[in-house]
Every structure is written in structure tokens, then in C-alpha cells.
Amino acid sequence: VNKKSSNQKKELIEFYRGMLLIRRFEEKAGQLYGMGLIGGFCHLYIGQEAVVVGLEAAAKEGDKRITSYRDHGHMLACGMDPNGVMAELTGRSGGYSKGKGGSMHMFSKEKNFYGGHGIVGAQVPLGAGLAFADKYRENNCVTFTYFGDGAANQGQVYETFNMAALWLSLIHISEPTRPGI
């Protein structure tokens, strides 16, 4: 077996493990939500695991991420501890937002994860702000801004597209939200 083929196989197995972690985590979160152990809303990322795992494979250290309220899978894909994510979902102080953010408002500056946001499309211009900060700092980082297809009709989304096309290192990812509903 040549080394390149062996490394590729290992990489594919890691992708699969990442997707499986997200799927199993979300299934458990859905179960806990149904039992009333997760307060508020709980928007699952089931059916979209490959999107974030693939993009995280292309991310480099220092790159930033921002997403909507369907954020658990993103946190897991960027290497955050599943126990910390679950603690946040269940309102415990060991969560990434000290149990105050719940399902939709998690955050970790250490992992360059700038949150899930509850307002449809609001994260898109916020992602542009993160990208502008990187441009001013001249640090060659990229911001990954995820949004659901429901945000695609929001004015600020298209305004941000125009800004990004002209000036920013910003990748917009439109995810179909139907699989998670």
C-alpha cells in the first residue's frame, strides 16, 4: 500500500468519525429534548454532517466560524468537547456559555467559534465583521459563515455578499435546513 493511499484512507476514516459523532450527538440531543431535559428550542443538525466536516478539513488555525441556531454540529466539528456542548444544551455551568446560551447561543473565542445566532441571517453581516477584523490585522485568516436556506431572502445577506466579493476573505455556506427539521 502506498503512503498517499494509506494517508487518504486515514483521513476518510476521520471524516466519517466526525460525521458519526455529530449524528449520534444530535440523536441524543433530540432524545433529551423530547424528555424535557433541554430547555428552549433545540434545532438539530441531522442530515448536514458532511458539510461542516468537509469545510473544517479545509480550515486552518485562526480561521473563524459563525453560524445560525443550528450550531451543535459546528462546535463538534471544530474540535470542541462534546461534554461541554451537552452541558450547555442542558443548562449546566460546565457548558461553553456557562449554561446560559442553551442550544442556540453557544460561543468559544478559544476555538474561534463566534456563535450560533437566533435571528435568521444575522450571523452573515457579523461574519463580515470578523473578516474585516482579520483584514485589518493582516493575518490571512478566513471566516466561514454558515446560514440556512431560509436566510437567503434577507436583505443583509445579499448586502454582505457584495461587501465580501469586493474586500473580504469570507466564505458563505448556505445549508439546506430541511434535513434537520
Give the positions of each predicted feature.
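Cofactor-/ligand-binding subdomain signature composed of acidic, glycine-rich
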Residues: 1-39, 61
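A generic structural signal for nonpolar/aromatic side chains embedded in well-ordered alpha-helices
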Residues: 19, 86-89, 173
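Cofactor-binding active-site loop characterized by glycine-rich and histidine/acidic residues
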Residues: 27-30, 35-167
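Single conserved hydrophobic/aromatic residue that forms the stacking wall/gate
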Residues: 172, 178-181
